[in-house]
Amino acid sequence: MDSAPSPSSLDFELSPPVLVTMTSTSSSASDNVEGADDDANTHGIFNWRDFSSCWRVSESNLYCFSLALLIWFFASFILIENLYGPKNVWLGPSSSILVEPSSIFVKSIKVKVLDYSEPGLQLYGFYRTPALDCFVNWSESRVLSISHESYKGWPYYLNSGSLLNITYTVKPQGSAVQLVVDEGHQGVPQSVLNDPAYRYNVWSWNLIEGSGMIQLEIRKSSSYYLAVANLKSKDVEVELNIDVKAVLYDTKQSFYNCNFSNGECTFNAMSLVGNSVVVTSPAASQGVSIEDEWYIRFSYQPREIAYVIGTGVVICFMLVAIQFCNRFQCSGGEGHLTEDDSARTRLLADKDDDGSSMGSCDDSYANDDADLEEFMGNDGEASNRSRRLCAICFDVPRDCFFLPCGHSVSCYECGTTMQEADGSCPICRRKMKKVKRIYTV
């Protein structure tokens, strides 16, 4: 009676296991084992590699989400401080200034007179922008004694379309001074008057001597500072006659009026309705001197609910974008794995047709990881021989290389099959143009 074969004899009688393509195509044994582990994770019921890749996408998008949210808060802060932060404005006689805040971001406007001295200021509220079509003519004369290397100046607030006619006389004869008109009400720094490049950056610069006239047209509503500078080594006297044709806003259609009885006025903006505020100063003929001036401050109370809603909308938009990004990248990763698996199946099927390996393709998928570990566990000659075998079929030596990359990882038959199926090198993923056989002499 025949005795049962021992397990050791069965191991020698069985054919060598069929190994499939590994994800890693490195020639080292450790890289081959890692590739087999990747395949095991790919074909399991729970795809751990897809899950971990999606988690990495979510983690990176979380950083992007935090950065974008920080940028939004920073932009909101800049919007509040620059557009709707406190602003100081100087007003002279026969002036008017228009302020149009957004009813979405601004709840109310507070106008306060900082150096309250003369009455006459008026605040008007409108549903829409009033017409800029009221013309007022007024004039002033100034005699300035300017010492050497100094200047004198004063501000105006002028609306677009206003005209300035400046008639001048400089004494003594032969003396020259600079007549500068620049945007702003802070004056002209003494240090920049000697800079030749300053004249190209200022709104209007003229070197005047003797007698003459200069006409200026205002194209932007703003504060302007007029200065007369003497950079010579002797004192001069300058006579100026300034005729102003000012353009003011029409206040007849206003629905709100405040006369600054206590030095300040507050205008409550209405939501989803246009809001405009005009502050006017009295004319010089109404008991007001040409030298009278008002220094006022505009301050805004923000509408907090608008910023809260805006932040919520930004967060929702970013969450939706991140969700679409995750789905796109994860679904793209799954499709790529499926394509590689199908390519491996076709390669192994071609090898099975040649009779060089045993077992079905399904069996090889089920047992390739265990066989690979057993195969790569051998040392010495077997390990060196495995480095020279085809990384696809492990049956014949590597006898080809790919053009143009030059990698050599398979036999000529497997390389030709890869070129026909996928067409890309498994090492660098570059497109293969040719598969060249290596002949051994």
Swiss-Prot record:
Organism name: Arabidopsis thaliana
Tissue-specific expression: Expressed in the shoot apical meristems (SAM), root tips and inflorescences, and, at low levels, in floral buds and pollen.
Job of this protein: Involved in pollen mitosis II (PMII) regulation during male gametogenesis.
Main location: membrane
UniProt keyword list: Membrane, Metal-binding, Transferase, Transmembrane, Transmembrane helix, Ubl conjugation pathway, Vacuole, Zinc, Zinc-finger
Record-linked Pfam families: APD1-4_M, APD1-4_N, zf-C3HC4_3
Transmembrane annotation, as ranges: 60-80, 305-325
Molecular function terms, GO-annotated: transferase activity; zinc ion binding
Protein name: E3 ubiquitin-protein ligase APD1
Pathway it works in: Protein modification; protein ubiquitination
Gene designation per UniProt: APD1
Phenotype on disruption: No obvious defects during the vegetative developmental stage. The double mutant lacking both APD1 and APD2 exhibits an increased percentage of bicellular-like pollen at the mature pollen stage. Plants lacking APD1, APD2, APD3 and APD4 are defective for cell division in male gametogenesis resulting in severe abnormal bicellular-like pollen phenotypes.
InterPro entries to which the protein is assigned, alphabetical: APD1-4_M, APD1-4_N, Znf_RING, Znf_RING/FYVE/PHD
GO BP annotation list: mitotic cell cycle; pollen development; protein ubiquitination
PANTHER family: E3 UBIQUITIN-PROTEIN LIGASE APD1-RELATED (PTHR46858:SF5), OS05G0521000 PROTEIN (PTHR46858)
Top EC class for this record: transferase
Subcellular location: Endomembrane system; Vacuole membrane
